[in-house]
């Protein structure tokens, strides 16, 4: 099949890219490996998830949220928004298409994308002038290699598989990772009566959603360093010194940290209070080894657990199928070019949703990619 643009991934960034291209009447096809769009939100998000950012930072092009929508949305409200977005713009991804390879054919200056239809088992070949990688930052769940992990006698899961603490009442559960997922899952487990311990390796900023909302609004008018100083000061006033509870604050500000490392500040949902009250235990460092249900930590501490939830992020799988990834990506699956031109590569290869700026970043990428493709096509037409 031939088309002008192939988009790989039907998450928010992929959907937005298709809509933006359609606004310019540019033919495009979305290939999605799952059987539904936005599978991260529809299949892999835990039940109590709420968006930590205000609604104006969680919307896609050409369809802002209405006044009736609360400032901070639940998962259900955002999924409903995505459903309405797909219906309004009549987006029709090709589902159950696992991309096996993508290469640039120098002989005809086109991308050759090979995908497997996992329902029929057939191999499909797509040719396009432009290729957009929109699989996003959250690819495959990352579970680190730990000595003896295969001997663990309890349940092991990645945070993307976690739904609710309902089944963990009275069980000893370790959550590995002190980011937003780890902190929120710990809170949920504790609420359902699990004996919860969270393992935190690196320092993280902890703020309220209101403070981060203020900070993101101010970033439109003030430099990052100034906003970081204000946000950090407010966090100190609200929480005081949390180091005695095992929560350490980085030296670099929250927005600078997010910008340069991709690590977002933790938006507190009530976890800090439970840590202060001793309802959630904190261990700093990493896991040394596992033997049955007994875990030995790097600090020498030993403890038995019934379950481990790895909230240890994701790893990009882009380089596994994008053979010519070096035109836009590094080996870690993130853009080579610095912001704000991170979305544009060579040979008409683009990426959307890799800016480490969440939904808003994916929306910005989508508009930039579509505008650039429109400009290139217009130039070719005039020549």
UniProtKB/Swiss-Prot annotation:
Its cofactor is FAD. Keywords: Auxin biosynthesis, FAD, Flavoprotein, Monooxygenase, NADP, Oxidoreductase. Belongs to the FMO family. Pathway: Plant hormone metabolism; auxin biosynthesis. It comes from the Eukaryota. One of its GO terms (molecular function) is NADP binding. This is Probable indole-3-pyruvate monooxygenase YUCCA10. Gene3D superfamilies: FAD/NAD(P)-binding domain (3.50.50.60). Involved in auxin biosynthesis. GO terms for biological process: auxin biosynthetic process; response to ethylene. Its EC number is 1.14.13.168. The keyword RNA-binding does not apply. Pfam families: Pyr_redox_3 (PF13738). Induction: Up-regulated by drought. NADP(+) binds at residues 177-182. InterPro entries: Auxin_biosynth/cation_transpt, FAD/NAD-bd_sf, Flavin_mOase. FAD binds at residues 9-14. It catalyses: indole-3-pyruvate + NADPH + O2 + H(+) = (indol-3-yl)acetate + CO2 + NADP(+) + H2O.
